[in-house]
Every structure is written in C-alpha cells, then in structure tokens.
Amino acid sequence: MSRQHPTRTVAAVALAASALLASCSTQKDDDAGGGVVIESPPGVARPPYRFSARDEALLEEVQRGAFNWMWATSDPAKGVETGMCPDRTSKPTVSIAGVGFQLSGLCVGVERGWITREQGRGRAELILRSLAANPENRKAGLFYHFIDPVTAGQPADAYERVVSTIDSALLFAGVITASSYFGGDVARLGDALFRDADWRFFVAPRDAEDPQIRRFVTLGWKPEDAEAPTGKGSLLPYGWVDSGDEHRLVTFLGVCAPRETHRLDAAVYYRLRRQLGGYPGAERMVWFPWSGALFAAFFANCWIDYAGMGPDNPSAFTDLPRARVDWWENSRRTMLLHRAKAVENPLGLPGFGENGWGLSASDVEGGYAVPGLFPDALPMQALIPGSIPVRDYTEWDAKDDWGDGTIAPYAAGCCVMFDPAAAVAALRHMRGLRPGGDRSLWSDPASGGFGFQDAYNERTGWVAPDCVAIDQGPLLLAIENARTGLIWRTFHAHRFVRGGMERLGMQRTNRR
C-alpha cells in the first residue's frame, strides 16, 4: 500500500516546486513543443567509465555471478531442452523477458572469456530454434509472457496466460543483440522472429473504451480459451502511454520493425506522455506516475544507448506539447532521487542510507512486490503551455511506497550506468552484508556461486532464497555497458535498429 511521506507538508511541497520552477541551471526552456529541455549539466561524465583496479574486480565478480546463474540454470545437459534460463531459481517456467537478458548476456560471457564463442553461439541458436519451432508460444509474432522450458509452448503453471508486449520487447532486444553479435544461423533465426512481430496488431483502436490508450500499444493480448493460445482473444484494456523505460522500449522496437505493415509510426514514441516532476538535488525529470520502482529508469537503457544521445526533439514528430529529454540524464536524476530519499529514510527503516538504496520490483518475504519512490509533481500547464490533463499528464497523486523495507541489489547495481561511484559503493556494501546473521546475501562466483541473491531486508533479517532472471540479467548488462559499452554497440550495429533510429530522428552524437 502507498504511504504518505510523513516529513512533507503541503507547504513544503509547494516551496520545493517553486524552487524547481525557478531553477534553470541544468534545463532550459525551448520554443519547440512549448516545452522544457532536460539535459546534463557541464562536467557530468558518461559511460563507458574508467574504474580503479579494485572496482573493476568487484564489478567483474558481480557480473560473473549473474552470468553463472543464467548459464548453469539453462544447461541442456540438465534437462533444459530449450536452453532457456528459468524465471527464478525455484521455478523452471521460463519468462521470455529473462531470455532477452540471457541472450545478450551470452555476448558478455564470450567477451569476458567465461565461455567460448562456440558455446555462446550454440546456446543462442538452441534458444532461437526452440522459440521458432513452437507456434503456440506467440500471437501475431509477439510472445506469451511464460513458456515451458522443455517444449517452448504453454506451461502448466503460469500465473497468467497473456501475450505480453513488454516481455516480448525485452526478448527481442536480446534477440537483436545476439543476432548482431553472433551472425550466421543465430542472425537468420533471430531476424526472422523479429521480422514476424506485428506491433500494429497490439495497438488500441481509435474507439477503445479508455480514451487514454487509443492509438497506443496495449500491454498485450489474452486468448478467450487457454487451450487455444493462437485462436480468438482480445487486447488488454491497458496501454503504454507514459515514458518509463518499458514504454519507450516497446515503442522503440515497434518503430524498428522491418516490415512496414507491422511497424509503428515514429510519432507514437513521441506522443508518449512526459509528465514533469522534481526533487531537491535531482531537479526536473520526467516520471512515470504509476510506478516509482527504479527498474523503470534503466531497463531500456540496457540496450538503447541514450548515454550516446542528447535531448530528443518531439516537435519534429507531433504537435503535442512535450519536453525535450535526454533520457540518460533523466534516468540519472531518477537514481539521485532514490538515493536521496534513502538517505533521508523518513520511516527509519533499517538498512537504508547512502549505500543502502534501490527500491524496485523484487522478491519479498511475502512473495513479490513493486515498491517505489516519486518526485513532487510540477504544474504542467505552467511549465508547458497547452498541456491538458489525461492527454499530456495524469492528475494521479502518487505517494512513496517503501513496501516492507526490502532492498534489491540489482537496482542500485544497474545505476552504475548513471553514477558509477554511488553504485559501486552500494554493491561493495551489500556484498558484505549478512542480514540474517548466519546467512550471507552473496555466494562466491569463483566457486560457481551466483553473486547476489535477489533481495534482502535488514529489518527482519530475511534474504531471498532465489535469484530472478529479470534482476540478474539487467545487472549483468548494465555493468558491461558501464565498463565497455558492449551491449549498446552491438545492439545499435543491427540494421533493424539503425532503421528505427533513422525513423525516430535519433543519432548517437556522443559516440565516435
């Protein structure tokens, strides 16, 4: 349940908002779109970074642990006939989102010398052949959220049976990366799968019951009969209408579609709402009102090289009033907000502080939770004339949700792409924790261990028994991008991505 921030009064929020409105040190007004430009202040370093030998050693073992888990749990010799890693340690069912991270992670494993190129290529090819061979795992080219690890078809124990646009997007980001890296049959299989993805099929019609989602990509599709997964069904009544990382990744890949009949218009990406908020020390930012979980600031950044771009230009694609945003900088500010609020720690939760932060989707002692933190909403009509509710922003009053005080190491760790010093300090701190007294949060990768468990709670002493694919995966990729930029380079080298970038008017101007 969301909770009111106990240390903030209405007057304090108003004062903070006034200060943020007056601040223009790192953002400037721009006539295009009637909006605001969010960009980095001078002197902010961008990845890849140079790390000390000590920090490199820590990052290497964190990555190795995450890779060990994905490699060991997907071993065909142990009965995983499709070669796909499970959703979590204790559950063999596959999340296709996790497979997207896994496919990209194979590239890291080869580059780091943990597996041979032939091993990586073989595992990637097995995964893609398995996906392609079972038509009951997809509809209109996009995939069901959960699939069986042996048949790649419908699993018996999935908690939902929906074709998911975001989980398919995460899968396809990995497919494209592996295709670009390995070439050959991996590219042939992967490119064919992405070519078949019909993103337009999942767009809400102009007469959709909820006017907010009209002409935006929906969250997915559900069959009328679970026994007929490719038969009749209906789109989910929810849409990707805001500008979190998931929203942008789905829409970006839709614009990258090689078949014009399947492709989204670039304007869909720029019509996504860009609601403005702010917080002292983090300044203005675009925020997602429905989730303050930190993963919503870095999932797309695992593949899309926003660090190599500057502010975008929505006015070239839409007449709607939209701020111009450097999305890497926006994510950096979101990370600063999370860390600042952890230091403030208004509820006095044990474990939170300058090195204890990272509220995000993760396992908790009672199951699974998605806590999150939010900036203060700023007056959109004052900042961007012409803005109107619903179309351009929501009037939802989002409240900070600290959950039960559980912290997920991957959340702070992935922010190494935005603030390497803060992220490395947090990882080093968490590596040495023993929240349960006799149980460590860490298992040594040098001995085949998996690094961090999924989450921990210092108030109760609980440590998650599982590792989770969609948490281990981004940690592996984010660190690699911070160190070398490998995933960004490989993803952007693919011709489908180059085509999408051109349609979106994007350029990696910070890359040589």
Language-model segments: which ranges?
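Bacterial N-terminal signal peptides that target proteins for export
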Residues: M1-V13
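C-terminal motif of bacterial Sec signal peptides marking the signal peptidase cleavage site
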Residues: L21-S23
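Bacterial signal peptide processing site
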Residues: S25-K28
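Ser/Thr/Asn(+Pro)-rich, low-complexity disordered segments
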Residues: G35-R512
